[in-house]
């Protein structure tokens, strides 16, 4: 039986590390990935975003420590950026109000027929294109 594919967005990774609402969902997915019920992935662009966000907010040492922790989790980093992924990312970026990094991540989700775990409102515009597992969105302070 083929495993279900699940991709973590940067926001889901940060939710896990920061202990934000929705962390339990990410933890459960990690547990399921160790029993081979699902395949859990992180796109390279999400790993890069995770690193530089930690670097900017907490410094290089913490960024390095957290990145090492990320790489030790039961997830596989998606490094493929072949032509189909480039074209799909370009199509999504041209068609929807999303960032370049989100277009790359969404292209993986689309082409791998995966589900995306996130808490980024930008992805909600893609709900007809990709499968979404939306974590509780952060409330905006007025």
Question: Which stretches of residues belong to each language-model region?
Answer:
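Short, well-structured N-terminal submotif of metal-dependent ribonuclease cores
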Residues: 1-42, 55-68, 140-142
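Acidic, PIN/NYN-like endoribonuclease modules and their adjacent C-terminal/linker elements
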Residues: 1-5, 78, 106, 111-142
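A generic structural signal for short hydrophobic patches within well-formed alpha-helices
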Residues: 13-14, 47, 123-124
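Structured helix-beta-strand junction loops
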Residues: 35-37, 73, 112, 129
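Helix-loop "lid/cap" segments that line or gate small-molecule binding pockets
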Residues: 53-54, 75
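Active-site neighborhoods of divalent-metal-dependent phosphate/nucleic-acid chemistry enzymes
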Residues: 76-119
């Amino acid at each position: 039986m083929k495993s279900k594919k699940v991709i973590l967005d940067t926001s889901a990774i940060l939710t896990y590390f920061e202990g934000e609402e929705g962390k339990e969902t990410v933890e459960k997915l990690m547990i399921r990935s160790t029993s081979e019920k699902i395949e859990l992935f992180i796109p390279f662009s999400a790993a890069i975003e995770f690193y530089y966000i930690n670097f900017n907010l907490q410094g290089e040492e913490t960024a390095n420590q957290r990145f090492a922790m990320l790489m030790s989790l039961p997830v596989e980093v998606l490094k493929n950026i072949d032509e189909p992924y480039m074209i799909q990312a370009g199509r999504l970026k041209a068609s929807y109000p999303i960032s370049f990094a989100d277009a790359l991540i969404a292209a993986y989700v689309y082409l791998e027929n995966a589900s995306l775990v996130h808490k980024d409102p930008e992805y909600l515009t893609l709900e007809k294109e990709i499968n979404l597992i939306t974590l509780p969105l952060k409330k905006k302070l007025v």
